[in-house]
Amino acid sequence: MSSIIDIFAREILDSRGNPTVEVEVELDSGAVGRAAVPSGASTGAFEAVELRDGDKSRYLGKGVLKAVQNVNDIIAPELIGMEAQDQVAIDKAMIELDGTPNKSKLGANAILGVSLAVAKAAAEECGLPLYQYIGGVNAKTLPVPMMNILNGGKHADNNVDIQEFMIMPVGAPNFREALRMCSEVYHNLKNVLHSKGLSTTVGDEGGFAPNLTSNEEAIQVILEAIEKAGYVPGEDIVLALDPASTELYKEDGKYHFEGEGIVRTPEEMVDFWEQLVNKYPIVSIEDGLAEEDWNGWKLLTERLGKKIQLVGDDLFVTNTQRLSKGISMGVANSILIKLNQIGTLTETLDAIEMAKRAGYTAVVSHRSGETEDSTIADLVVGVNAGQIKTGAPARTDRVVKYNQLLRIEEALGSTAQYLGKNAFYNIKK
């Protein structure tokens, strides 16, 4: 066992050029852990609070010097001397120190940076890779990538309403081949778009961001790219969508697809998703309805919950209270896991545990504003989640996670598992 002797935070930049928090934790053994905190664009109203300075003369108000100061002046003195391996006690101490339900006093970005850096330092102290420190001897499942290759909504400056169009290589024998398949489709998609005279600039998460005639056209160009890469849609590679519907939901209680000029009621949204699922090989829809449209979610789950994966992101915000409500209402069948939505490693693990016990899947995810930190790669293997969302095979802030997963698969050798279609263990195949 080794105790914490130093905690230090600094302001660094994320992949969008905005400031974020990085924390280093040192133990008396000399072990050091470093973690950087991500930041979202389409954030749920119920997420833990990311503390920003608000000083318009610095970084347009997005500085994080307050959060950095909170780590250095408030959190560090409280935690120095604590055992690094006592993650639960450390996270609990920070939650109590903050004293608010949404971490708005110290900032979830301050607290999470410390929480993850402590775990990394403790893993180094134990001589274990982070995934094994988190998950123990049974951490062996490599995730199916849910790879975002075409961007719209808040992740791109185009007329496509649906935020993410993703591919999932369920027919791959292992993670390495899964990544290759996705990369090949990505490059073929670039050629398909180019041949149609469409833009191949990329969005925040590395996916292409062309202007298209409809959201459905996005699906069609991806299917064309899958076939051109030599794969069979629906067998080798399936599709997943993240419409980020909270962003489409307006005060009139309807969903506004401004790119297409269409307005839909919650019932019409459910009909729309059902039509797409019946027409295309879509196996997962994330945030198909808005974060507070519980009745719409209930209807969506009744109609499609046995057939496809329905992921709650803004709906659940990695929060056990929100998830518990969803489970009791029979809403959705999967939770998206974003570390910075809740703000500590312990609470993140609690949400994953609750989801699994209820028969919900868990999909570990990046944010649109990322860094070179690859913690989520270790987390997804550590908890055997089986699915990861971490963007396109482009932009180093995305690729760093995939490369870490390649290293983990290599280290696990013959014990590594890749679930493919079995990652969706709670729906009928």
Curated annotation (Swiss-Prot):
Pathways per UniProt: Carbohydrate degradation; glycolysis; pyruvate from D-glyceraldehyde 3-phosphate: step 4/5
Name of the top EC class for this enzyme: lyase
Active site: E205, K338
Cofactor(s) the protein needs: Mg(2+)
One GO term describing the cellular component: phosphopyruvate hydratase complex
GO function term, MF aspect, one: phosphopyruvate hydratase activity
Reaction it catalyzes: (2R)-2-phosphoglycerate = phosphoenolpyruvate + H2O
A Pfam family that the UniProt record links to this protein: Enolase_C
Residues involved in Mg(2+) binding: D242, E286, D313
PANTHER family: ENOLASE
Protein name as annotated: Enolase
Organism whose genome encodes this protein: Thermoanaerobacter pseudethanolicus (strain ATCC 33223 / 39E) (Clostridium thermohydrosulfuricum)
Lineage, broadest ranks: Bacteria, Bacillati, Bacillota, Clostridia, Thermoanaerobacterales
